[in-house]
């Protein structure tokens, strides 16, 4: 390029929902597991999943979990401001109105769905080794067995309309509650545990 030619200034724009992925600390993971063991409420009638065991956390458990969850919501707020390239007029306030654990087994799945409220998340507590191997052997282009896929838009060509991910233990996604997502079934005889 000759010295007298100017560089073209280019800017790309973020488009669609703000979706973030991060790793939770071990103490947060531990309290989610410990409190899930106390869950007695069947949550299946409130959820879209084709999953036999979906249990709700009690209000007492949710109150224990909030101090662990709050810093991650703060991270989301900062990332959202960066994503929007503007500061909040007023810092968002959140209420943990529901919390449940999904104990997904062989052939079970979560069809495309969204969540109630304004903001939501999913945290992965257990991804068994045989499921990891099944996913590694998968040859398709979707999220594969036991994976999660977030969808936005009409699927127009030359447009990114989904994000696929095979989770690891401790992964956390935070996203607008209206963002559609789904979970693929798998054939391995094991239990994959997530919390939302």
Q: Where would I find each of the regions flagged by the language model?
A:
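Non-heme Fe(II)/2-oxoglutarate
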Residues: 2-100, 104-110
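Catalytic core of non-heme Fe(II) oxygenases with the double-stranded beta-helix
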Residues: 97-174, 184, 191
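Glycine-rich nucleotide phosphate-binding loop and flanking beta-alpha elements
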Residues: 181
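A domain-level signal for the structural core that forms small-molecule/cofactor-binding pockets
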Residues: 194
